[in-house]
């Protein structure tokens, strides 16, 4: 993703979208080259904490005890960047971003623009039918 200079962008990932990346540490390292702040946002705080610890990610923000909508709103208010970009998967992610003043970018588009590899699981199991296949 070729964004503005690093002092102008806050980049947030929805946890499910971030799990789609094949090499999460490389995504964070690359994003830091052109973003001032990089972090994860999701409603399930325990899942975020576990994922961050498992992958030893060094992030600037996490959702805390807030839901996704409130986290987006508060992070936007506290970060002094011109641009706030939220990478997500669902229509709910898009709605949350747009209603809190963030730009929404689908994970596939972000990966393509930035050259970030997605897991095979992401492409094979995207959408409703993919989730059904996961059950069996």
Residue ranges and their predicted role:
Residues 1-36, 53, 69-83, 90-136:
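Asp-based, Mg2+/Mn2+-dependent phosphohydrolase catalytic module
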Residues 27-38, 43-62:
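Substrate-recognition/cap helix-loop segment adjacent to the acidic, metal-dependent catalytic center
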Residues 42-47, 88-91, 111:
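Short beta-alpha junction loops
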Residues 58-64, 104-108:
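Short hydrophobic/aromatic-enriched beta-strand-loop microsegments
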């Amino acid at each position: 993703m070729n964004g503005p200079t690093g002092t102008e962008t806050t980049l947030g990932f929805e946890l499910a979208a971030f799990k789609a990346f094949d090499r999460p540490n490389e995504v964070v390292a690359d994003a830091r080259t052109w973003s001032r702040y990089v972090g994860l946002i999701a409603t399930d705080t325990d899942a975020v904490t576990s994922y961050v610890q498992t992958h030893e990610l060094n992030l600037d923000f996490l959702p805390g005890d807030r839901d996704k909508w409130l986290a987006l709103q508060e992070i936007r208010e506290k970060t002094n960047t011109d641009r706030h970009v939220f990478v997500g998967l669902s229509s709910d992610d898009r709605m949350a971003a747009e209603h809190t003043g963030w730009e929404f970018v689908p994970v596939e588009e972000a990966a393509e623009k930035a050259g970030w590899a997605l897991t095979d699981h992401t492409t094979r199991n995207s959408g409703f039918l993919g989730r059904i296949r996961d059950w069996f």
